[in-house]
Structures are given as structure tokens and as C-alpha cells.
């Protein structure tokens, strides 16, 4: 490949009439020699407001060094982030999922607006990963995602703790099982430094999924944020994206149907977040890959849950790194026929070739259970259907002993009202707490319910009270919870007409989610109900008017997909 071929976009600056453009670029340090090399963007979601992202500006500098050492010209950019753990339980949570698509759009705008030939995207918090990947898939130029790494566990009285420990501490305090001082000690020790939340929560789930897809370097997702391996991974990403340019390797070569099947497989085996369904659907949509909720159930039925990771297990993601990391898990699954080993990745090698360089899981380790004795015989993410969710709903059942829950609904139109009911002991064992009008359009922004779910678990009701919503759950959530109910209430889905006292059934064996309300009664309620208007101001107003159903990934450009799958 010639240098001009590698400069498939930046060569636009070569002509005489682009002299003014080059004048601006010279002010940034470029010389005649630099104009002969590819321009590679390095874009991160660096921000000082959260440990997930506070270190990413320095990581951007490392990626630049990698790009430069490979003979290209690096240019660093920045985009936004919304910290879920800080926004949780506040009006700011409506901006979390919204930020995924803002990140995607801003990366595409910055990289396309400056005609870069390739780029490295660096992210840390939950929506950074899918936002970056949507942009990568839409642009289809050589690109690599590099994860900022997982946070180290906090330690209190010799025990590992994390952010979810604090959320659950609120429920224990309300139940009288913890003092305010106990909660304060959790608060002050849960987050010891930089990195994404430390269990198999959404950030680590999506970083893992991207590595499995083949769009991050092998090992990237499980390297702790403060490790030497992580720094090397970031710099290597800069070198690797230049190699992608040399090979003419594009995301569309990597993001195949088989890649998404493998990403779902590893997500099931590790017990990943429910948000993986939403984000993988959105990334697949951007990549023109046909993927649906039904695919998750198909894979769920054949892939066992192996990882004893938080939130339902006892280990954090750093523990997985110490016994071999995601590559060792993939190697184990590949050897047992669960993965497609012959597909290409961002290294230019196949999955099998990449994994050949890694060791097996450490003998005697306890983080990953053997296939012959799994934590659960099938996957923990289940797609439910029924007259309460005709287009589907997502349940995470890892650690849940109850197979079937039938109980009366207690219906709330906001999380705040539901939280108040929990705090005042209005929620009793057997209840089905329903929070609606918090979907993609209704929220707007489909906020997560970690504050609410953690309070229920903290009060000892995690297996005794079901929690249903057309909103989302944090990857840190566990218990009897069902989210992403579609159609959402704002779209006139059946959940909009559910009433307190109606009997609701959730069954993980039959994959049922239903309400004991006849079609005749449902039609009567529809006639009696006026749905609220869509939010209409600012970015949330824009989002509410264009976002798709959660069953389609809550994407903001669904209108332009024709039957052939072409955009």
C-alpha cells in the first residue's frame, strides 16, 4: 500500500487550493514532511468529574506516542461523558443514554470534519463504549477502541467493596441494619482511584464485548486502569490503528454477524449487564448487521454462566485479570466450541491466532467456574415476552433463586415515587414494583434504576419483590428485575394501562411477562387514558422525538434503514 493510499482522506489537503487549510494545520505543528503521512485522530471522553474518565487525557497522550512511532501524525480530540454513578437517582440520569448517541455523533463529526485517515477512541464510563463503537461502525474507516480500564476494588475492614456496596448500604441503613457512620465509611473507601466501576457492570461488560467483537486489542478490556499492561495497551492501540491503515482493514471487515454472536456468548458466560442488549443492538444497527432480541435468547439457551463476578458473585474484574483476563476466558470458550475462531480482528489476525499468544486460565482459580459445573446452566440474560411486553423485555437472573414470581402490581410513574414507597415500607414481600413512563421517549433517556433496586436488595427483599420498568437497570443491579419493557408506556405499550393491584407474572423458565388483564379491559383502559406529551425542550426533546424503541437498541437513526439493511 502506498502512502497516498493510507492517506485516503487527508490527501484532500494536498492540492494548491488547500493552501489555507494547510496554513491552519501548520499552526498546530505540522511540517512539509508531516503532510506526507496519514493523520490519525485520538479522541477520548476525558473529564475530571468521574474516576471512570479522569485519567483518559494522559492515555490520549500515550496513544499519540503509539501513532507517531508508527509513522503517522496524531491529533488529539475530546468529547463528552455523563457519569452514571454520579447522575444515578437524579434528573441528570436522563442524559446518560442520551450521551451515548451524542458521543457517537460528536466523534463522527470531529473525525469526518477533519478528514482523519484513522482514529483511536478511548473511553471509560458506560456509554463511552457503545457511543464510540456506533461512530466507528458508521464511519467505517480504520479505528480501534481502547478502554480506560477497570478501577481497583475498595477495601473496608479487609473486605473488597465497590460503588454498588454504597448504593446497597442505603437500603441497609433504611432497614436499620447499618448506621449512617457505616454508610459514610463505605462512601469514603469504595472508589480508591481511576477506572470504570469494578464488577461485571456495564462499563466492563461493554469493554469486554468490544474486545470480543475484535475492535480492541486482545486483553484490553480486563487490564486495570492503573496497571502497566493498560498503559502499554493504550500506546499499542496507536500503533495498531496505523497497521490497520496499512492493511486496508476496516470495521466492516470485523463487525460481522459471527462477531456479534461471540460478543453475546462471552457476555452470557461472564454474566454481563442487561445494557449489553441495548448497546449491541445499536452497534449492530450502525454496522448493518441483522441482530434482534431473539438472538440473545437463542444464545442464552446454549451458553452457561461461568463467572463468579459482582454484582451477583464475589469477585471484581481485577480478579479476572489476575487469573488470565478476558483472553483466557475466550480461549476456554473457543476450545469448547462456543466461539468463531476464524474471523478477523483489528490486529489483522484471527481470533484463534490472537488467543494462541495467551495463557490459559490460572490452574485452581475460582473466578471462572468450569463448564461441567457452571454457576448457571444457561445464560443469565433472558428476553421475556407476553401481554405486558409484546416487543420484549430484558431480565438478568444471575443470583436469583426465584424462578417464577406472581404478585400484585404497585405502579409508579416516576422512580422518585417508587423510592419513597420503599423508604416508607409501603412495598411488602410478594409485590411487583412497576416504574413506567421512563423509557427512551418517556424518560426521556431511559434512566437506570440502581438507586431503587439497590434499596430493595439492601432491605433484604431482592428475591421477594419484583421490579419492572420500561427504563433500564445499571450493570450493578441484581435481584428480580426486568427492564426495557417494550413498547414503552410513552408509546402506548400495555405497561401504560397497568394499574395497582393487577396481578403480574414473571417466569424465567417460560420467559413470560404478563398481566392478568383481559383484552376487553385493556381496550377500555386505553380509551380512558390520555398519554402525556413528549418532552419538547433542548437535547432531551430532540432525543424523545427521534429515538427508537429499546427493542431496537434505542437508536436515533432508525428511520433510514430499509428492508435490505442498507442505510
UniProtKB/Swiss-Prot annotation:
<dbReference type="Pfam" id="PF24877">
    <property type="entry name" value="ILV_EDD_C"/>
</dbReference>
<dbReference type="InterPro" id="IPR037237">
    <property type="entry name" value="IlvD/EDD_N"/>
</dbReference>
<comment type="function">
    <text>Functions in the biosynthesis of branched-chain amino acids. Catalyzes the dehydration of (2R,3R)-2,3-dihydroxy-3-methylpentanoate (2,3-dihydroxy-3-methylvalerate) into 2-oxo-3-methylpentanoate (2-oxo-3-methylvalerate) and of (2R)-2,3-dihydroxy-3-methylbutanoate (2,3-dihydroxyisovalerate) into 2-oxo-3-methylbutanoate (2-oxoisovalerate), the penultimate precursor to L-isoleucine and L-valine, respectively.</text>
</comment>
<feature type="modified residue" description="N6-carboxylysine">
    <location>
        <position position="127"/>
    </location>
</feature>
<feature type="binding site">
    <location>
        <position position="125"/>
    </location>
    <ligand>
        <name>[2Fe-2S] cluster</name>
    </ligand>
</feature>
<dbReference type="GO" id="GO:0009099">
    <property type="term" value="P:L-valine biosynthetic process"/>
</dbReference>
<dbReference type="Pfam" id="PF00920">
    <property type="entry name" value="ILVD_EDD_N"/>
</dbReference>
<dbReference type="InterPro" id="IPR042096">
    <property type="entry name" value="Dihydro-acid_dehy_C"/>
</dbReference>
<protein>
    <recommendedName>
        <fullName>Dihydroxy-acid dehydratase</fullName>
        <ecNumber>4.2.1.9</ecNumber>
    </recommendedName>
</protein>
<feature type="binding site" description="via carbamate group">
    <location>
        <position position="127"/>
    </location>
    <ligand>
        <name>Mg(2+)</name>
    </ligand>
</feature>
<keyword id="KW-0001">2Fe-2S</keyword>
<comment type="pathway">
    <text>Amino-acid biosynthesis; L-valine biosynthesis; L-valine from pyruvate: step 3/4.</text>
</comment>
<dbReference type="InterPro" id="IPR050165">
    <property type="entry name" value="DHAD_IlvD/Edd"/>
</dbReference>
<dbReference type="GO" id="GO:0051537">
    <property type="term" value="F:2 iron, 2 sulfur cluster binding"/>
</dbReference>
<comment type="pathway">
    <text>Amino-acid biosynthesis; L-isoleucine biosynthesis; L-isoleucine from 2-oxobutanoate: step 3/4.</text>
</comment>
<keyword id="KW-0460">Magnesium</keyword>
<keyword id="KW-0456">Lyase</keyword>
<feature type="binding site">
    <location>
        <position position="52"/>
    </location>
    <ligand>
        <name>[2Fe-2S] cluster</name>
    </ligand>
</feature>
<dbReference type="InterPro" id="IPR056740">
    <property type="entry name" value="ILV_EDD_C"/>
</dbReference>
<feature type="active site" description="Proton acceptor">
    <location>
        <position position="474"/>
    </location>
</feature>
<dbReference type="InterPro" id="IPR004404">
    <property type="entry name" value="DihydroxyA_deHydtase"/>
</dbReference>
<comment type="similarity">
    <text>Belongs to the IlvD/Edd family.</text>
</comment>
<feature type="binding site">
    <location>
        <position position="84"/>
    </location>
    <ligand>
        <name>Mg(2+)</name>
    </ligand>
</feature>
<keyword id="KW-0028">Amino-acid biosynthesis</keyword>
<feature type="binding site">
    <location>
        <position position="197"/>
    </location>
    <ligand>
        <name>[2Fe-2S] cluster</name>
    </ligand>
</feature>
<dbReference type="InterPro" id="IPR000581">
    <property type="entry name" value="ILV_EDD_N"/>
</dbReference>
<keyword id="KW-0479">Metal-binding</keyword>
<dbReference type="GO" id="GO:0000287">
    <property type="term" value="F:magnesium ion binding"/>
</dbReference>
<keyword id="KW-0408">Iron</keyword>
<feature type="binding site">
    <location>
        <position position="126"/>
    </location>
    <ligand>
        <name>Mg(2+)</name>
    </ligand>
</feature>
<dbReference type="InterPro" id="IPR020558">
    <property type="entry name" value="DiOHA_6PGluconate_deHydtase_CS"/>
</dbReference>
<dbReference type="GO" id="GO:0009097">
    <property type="term" value="P:isoleucine biosynthetic process"/>
</dbReference>
<comment type="subunit">
    <text>Homodimer.</text>
</comment>
<keyword id="KW-0100">Branched-chain amino acid biosynthesis</keyword>
<feature type="binding site">
    <location>
        <position position="448"/>
    </location>
    <ligand>
        <name>Mg(2+)</name>
    </ligand>
</feature>
<dbReference type="GO" id="GO:0004160">
    <property type="term" value="F:dihydroxy-acid dehydratase activity"/>
</dbReference>
<keyword id="KW-0411">Iron-sulfur</keyword>
